Amino acid sequence: MDVFAALGDPTRREVLRRVAGGPTTATRLALEMPISRQAVSKHLSALDEAGLVERTVSGREVRYSLRAEPLSDVVGWVTEVGKAWDQRLANLKSRLDR
């Protein structure tokens, strides 16, 4: 799964937001969210596949932490799209002001 597909789901975005607060487990996330531990694990798996989280196994516990590097692709894309729309709006304003 690519970064954009992973971020396309609002629940995954919320899981990622919570993981960004510091390393955590699926069990802890499930206690904080209105979804089951199995659902949290499914979303964490998708985020892991997209490279957005890192899994660290310690005994029986699996902790997840944020990997921010892939988000630079998102920031770059959003910046490009934003510039394109700014230019289009400036062109429209120019035409309307004539």
Residue ranges and their predicted role:
Residues M1-D2, D9, D48, D86, ...:
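Acidic side chains
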Residues M1-S36, S58-S72:
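N-terminal helix-turn-helix DNA-binding core of bacterial DNA-binding proteins
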Residues L31, D48-E49:
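Alpha-helical residues within the helix-turn-helix
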Residues R17, S72-R98:
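Amphipathic alpha-helical dimerization/coiled-coil segments
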Residues L44-S45:
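Short, hydrophobic-biased segments on the C-terminal half of alpha helices
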